[in-house]
From Swiss-Prot:
The gene is tyrS. NCBIfam families: tyrS. Homodimer. A motif ('KMSKS' region) lies at residues 226-230. InterPro entries: aa-tRNA-synth_I_CS, aa-tRNA-synth_Ic, Rossmann-like_a/b/a_fold, S4_RNA-bd_sf, Tyr-tRNA-ligase, Tyr-tRNA-ligase_bac-type, Tyr-tRNA-ligase_bac_2. A motif ('HIGH' region) lies at residues 42-51. GO terms for biological process: tyrosyl-tRNA aminoacylation. It is found in: Cytoplasm. This is Tyrosine--tRNA ligase. Keywords: Aminoacyl-tRNA synthetase, ATP-binding, Cytoplasm, Ligase, Nucleotide-binding, Protein biosynthesis, RNA-binding. Residues 339-400 form the S4 RNA-binding domain. It is an enzyme of class 6 (ligase).
Length: 403
């Protein structure tokens, strides 16, 4: 049986803040399974590793015997969460929201236990609300309080428009906790204002206020900006296993520890400390730790056999030994006259620009099927298929087709 200290250690792993810790301890001590909620607005069809930070924490609550609520914000998704935004979000259509929501349901059970998961839609209660009900809800907060939010304050100070419906978003998210009688709500650090709104509304409606647990925003592949599809620094959980492996193996050594803390369900805190000590002492190469994380992620979102095949493909390119046909084939569209190598590297996503590609060619850092490319003016035409590598970590198996 898990002790209170063990439960708190698992719940607190990677967390930025828990409000209020003493209330969490009291509810855990009661022995009654907690209702743990996290909301996801279906603004895009695919989830990426950044989204799984909250899903992993939900899974840890499930491991401790608690019930989690995966709340799909089909109603709030049409409003658009203003958190962290310096401009009004474009609202989504009902059709877009529902299509995205369907894909979410398919993806989350790669992490969550179906038996301990409620999937809910907040249109269940907001679809029944009258205009009078919404006005009553709006009366629970003031404009002055809303402007305490950093993003709203900045936009107000710089005379950027703030639409009235954006003020409603925190109230609507907060009311979700009332409707679901949540004991705990999880969210990113940028959601703290909205999560605290839930506490206040629950008290107003005579419920015990939920515990708020915030998680950090996961840094993307480059280790600086938060993971985002718009920035291209993400790993989608529906991506092929080879892409999950190769992208994970490209991250920096320091970022590896951060990802382990927020993404791994297999490596305990104690083991992570031990691994870090082994790397520091030189007993273990950082690549081995990264490979273990890559294997775990590829297995979670696919299966063990597929993960091992992906690792074999990655290893074949890195070492120059093995079967590179295990790598996924990426089609690159070229004109009839073909593309010079610099343009091909950029088109294949191996360099951010032709100038960077030219620099890599001058450094003799470009290989074709394991051989250094000596001719920086070489033109590639339809029918070419092979593995192109830039530096140690960037590679792709490409096939050229005429568009």
């Amino acid at each position: 049986m898990t002790t209170l200290d063990e439960s708190l250690a698992l719940i607190g792993r990677g967390a930025e803040e828990i409000l209020k810790l003493d209330q969490l301890e009291a509810r855990l001590t009661s022995g009654v399974p907690l209702r743990v909620k996290a909301g996801f607005d279906p603004t895009a069809p695919d989830l990426h590793l950044g989204h799984t930070v909250l899903l992993n924490k939900m899974r840890q609550f499930q491991q401790l015997g608690h019930q989690v609520i995966f709340l799909i914000g089909d109603f709030t998704g049409m409003i658009g969460d203003p958190s962290g935004k310096n401009a009004t979000r474009k609202p989504l259509s009902r059709e877009d929201v529902l299509a995205n929501a369907r894909t979410y349901e398919e993806q989350v059970f790669k992490i969550l236990d179906r038996e301990r998961t409620e999937v809910r839609f907040n249109s269940e209660w907001f679809g029944q609300m009258s205009a009078a009900d919404m006005i009553k809800l709006s009366a629970q907060h003031t404009v002055a309080r809303m402007l305490e939010r950093d993003d709203f304050a900045k936009r107000f100070g710089s005379q950027q428009p703030i639409a009235i419906h954006e003020f409603l978003y925190p109230l609507v998210q907060g009311y979700d906790s009332v409707a679901l009688r949540a004991d705990v709500e999880l969210g990113g650090t940028d959601q703290k204002f909205n999560l605290l709104m839930g506490r206040g509304l629950q008290e107003h409606y005579g419920q015990a206020p939920q515990i708020v647990l915030t998680m950090p925003l996961l840094e993307g592949l480059e280790g600086v900006a938060k993971m985002s599809k718009s920035l291209g620094n993400y790993i989608g959980i529906n991506e092929p296993a080879i892409d999950i492996v190769t992208k994970t193996m490209k991250i920096g050594d320091e970022l590896t520890w951060r990802w382990i803390d927020l993404l791994s369900l297999d490596i305990s805190v104690a083991e992570a400390v031990r691994l870090k000590e082994q790397v520091t002492s030189g007993e273990l190469h950082p690549r081995e730790v990264k490979l273990r994380l890559a294997r775990e992620l590829a297995t979670r979102f696919h299966d063990a056999a597929t993960a091992e095949q992906a690792i074999a493909g990655w290893h074949a390119v890195v070492t120059g030994q093995g079967d590179t046909s295990l790598l996924p084939l990426q089609e690159v569209v070229v004109p009839a006259e073909g593309l010079r190598i610099a343009s091909l590297l950029t088109a294949a996503g191996l360099t951010p620009s032709n100038s960077e590609a030219t620099r890599k060619l001058k450094e003799r850092a470009v290989k074709i099927d394991g051989e250094v490319l000596e001719d920086a003016t070489r033109v590639f035409t339809q029918g070419f298929e092979g593995v192109i590598q830039v530096g140690k970590r960037n590679f792709a198996r490409v096939s050229l087709v005429i568009g």
